[in-house]
Amino acid sequence: MKRQLILEDGSFFVGERFGSLKETTGEVVFNTGMTGYQEILSDPSYCGQIVTMTYPLIGNYGINRDDFEAIRPHVHGFIVKEACVKPSNWRGELTLDEYLKEKGIPGLSGIDTRKLTRLIRQYGTLKGMICGLDVDPVEAAAKLRAMEWPRDQVRRVSTKSAYPSPGRGERIVLIDFGMKHGILRELNKRNCDVIVLPYNATAEEVLGWHPDGVMLSNGPGDPKDVPEAIEMIRGILGKVPLFGICLGHQLFALACGANTEKMKFGHRGSNHPVKDLRTGKVAITSQNHGYTVTHESLSGTRLEVTHIALNDGTVEGLRHLDVPAFTVQYHPEASPGPEDANPLFDEFLALIREFNKKGEVIHA
């Protein structure tokens, strides 16, 4: 069955339907990863987006039980050049098509994904609609241009109540702004005693758990849409070691007086080189973000840039000069992608132990 993708600029792409038949709208973005589509589909950071995979053949190893990053997906659509109909992998239990149908996610295949990607690179991310051929592109484009982005995406994907993931090591409070399970898995590997809190937890609630450290997770949307989190971060700075990832990095920067802005088309993929300015080493990282901390806004703050993206020079890591806190824009847990940056979790635990030695950590 033929379906189409209509963009807000009036352009449209006709392809083959797979997955759900429902009509959908969202921000059309692209991901440059060759693999990891299951983790991408289940990453809450993609809430409200229609994801285009630049690699031409997707679905080769099917869908398994183990590689999900959240209980349910939040993507609004999935676009590929070719969707594999006969996957081959010993763990695979569903085809990509079967999974999308089960979760109600519309898919589109057979379009020129290279042309679509170049369009996004040239003009920036665009609002789009996956729909039937009976929809008029001109009328749909006008509706898309008038459509406003939702501002409550973090609320949609965050846990509604606190829950534990017990361990015998350091107690970590993990703030869930749309947390990937990969972050929790990395903390569990290190035997951390984790308490997951919702995005709107107050500083008093966070400190009430008497944590050894606080982690700020990834999540979707504009960091300025989560003012309560910015206030919470200000309330805990200096009282407990802090480590932020992706959206958590941006919220930390805002809490410290810096600014963020929307990128033209963002960083999404598992092959982004990042340079550590302290060591000169380069790591290949997994990334998924459409906003960035602006260099010029760091002047006058007590933040130091620790990492930059080699492709465009944007800020990829920050460290506070006065308190035990650091953040990165990329995903050290990978899931999917390379694990070059995985030692950052160990760096966080080392920071906690150093903080404890000084007798500064808050306990009951």
Curated annotation (Swiss-Prot):
Name of protein: Carbamoyl phosphate synthase small chain
SUPFAM superfamilies on file: Carbamoyl phosphate synthetase, small subunit N-terminal domain, Class I glutamine amidotransferase-like
Region listing for CPSase, in residue ranges: 1-167, 1-171
Domain Glutamine amidotransferase type-1 stretches: 171-358
Keywords: Amino-acid biosynthesis, Arginine biosynthesis, ATP-binding, Glutamine amidotransferase, Ligase, Nucleotide-binding, Pyrimidine biosynthesis
The encoding gene: carA
Pfam family of the protein (one): GATase
Gene Ontology MF term list: ATP binding; carbamoyl-phosphate synthase (glutamine-hydrolyzing) activity; glutaminase activity
PANTHER family noted in UniProt: CARBAMOYL-PHOSPHATE SYNTHASE SMALL CHAIN, MULTIFUNCTIONAL TRYPTOPHAN BIOSYNTHESIS PROTEIN-RELATED
Alphabetical list of InterPro entries matching this protein: Anth_synth/Amidotransfase, CarbamoylP_synth_ssu, CarbamoylP_synth_ssu_N, CarbP_synth_ssu_N_sf, Class_I_gatase-like, CPSase_GATase1, GATASE
The organism's place on the tree of life at top rank: Bacteria
